[in-house]
Amino acid sequence: MQGSRPLVRVVRLGLVSYQEGLRLQQVYVDRHRSGPAHSLLLCEHPPVYTTGIRHQPYPASRLDPLRLLGAEVHRANRGGLITFHGPGQLVCYPVLDLSGFRKSVRWYVAQLEKTVVSACGSLGVTATTSPHTGVWVGDNKICAMGIHCGRYVTSHGLALNCNTDLSWFSHIVPCGIEGKGVTSLSRELRRDVSVHEATPHLLAAFGEHFHCELSEDA
């Protein structure tokens, strides 16, 4: 039934630092303590490299040169290895209580991947999933994913390359996957595709694959 769909509030944060993004995610995570407060935080970050928690710490000898490029470096409580966030990248942090959807982290990640594949398709880019996490166009990753889930409340999420400066990725092995590259909507379509243009496609696909209603404050 239409009325039984979960309601998810879309929050557009604009350009915010990675640290501020972490702080705001925690604010929305905490709101779930008093009841369902499903939220979808959308933002862009200034240049920043982030590492996950499930693997060996990235050595300082490899992090310091990244700071010299003018980027911040942070360790986050998400899965995955090192990746880059920066302007021109649509970052989406779903803060959902999976009890209101399906209490399965595997299902959740699969729905995120389907969401991005559909969004890319509606823009004219044929993207796929692979044994590696994220969404790909051939051997090039167009969207990175890394999530955290505590007591079935999600945080962190995905980063879709729209018109990102891809040269930032040349200084790392994105997500620790050797022999693979990165791409963007702009590169694939050979025209400029902004975060503003891509956002409604991602939101429509999210509502479809998570079977939810999206709302925004006027």
Describe each region flagged by the PLM.
Residues 1-137, 141-142, 193:
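N-terminal lobe of the biotin/lipoate ligase/transferase fold
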